[in-house]
Amino acid sequence: KDVVLLNLIGVRVVLVHGGGPEISEMLEKVGKESVFLNGLRCTDDETMDIVQMVLCGKVNKNLVSMLQKAGGRGVGLAGVDGNLFEAVRRDEEHGNVGNIVDVHPEIVLDVLEKGYIPVVSSIAAGVDQTMNYNINADFAAEKLAIALHAKKFILLTDVKGLMRDFRDEDSLIREVKMSQVPGLM
């Protein structure tokens, strides 16, 4: 409801989401183990299919529906739509996990211009357009905020917060300036 209210008073809100718990739940349903390395999901081809189904389908459309039930007007997008996010493979160990190297925010700007709330899933097209990549939603949100020259960046998460060391809850960073974010990645 807060997002809808912000939109109604003229604040241009963009939602970027992941769906880790929902992906893990679906993987479990199909008998596939979730594997993580350095806090990121290792994503082979089969896992990537499930990641895309869950993020671009279930999670994205549920968020759009929630916005609309609250009186907002949401539009679901994936990072591959309009070539929004372009990525390269992070490394071999993580499989189809990518790092965003370019952002083309025109589709998001078009949606915002029409008064809708863009809801973006964190899937990116490969630079060579031969495959898609699973992108950490926090990283995708940061890259999009920079490309949009966002005045505010609000991170909603199911974890305690931004950590200097993700394994150490005492390393929580309570406040950060946008200019400091790249150095934390």
What is each stretch, according to the model?
Residues 1-185:
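Nucleotide/pyrophosphate-binding catalytic subdomain
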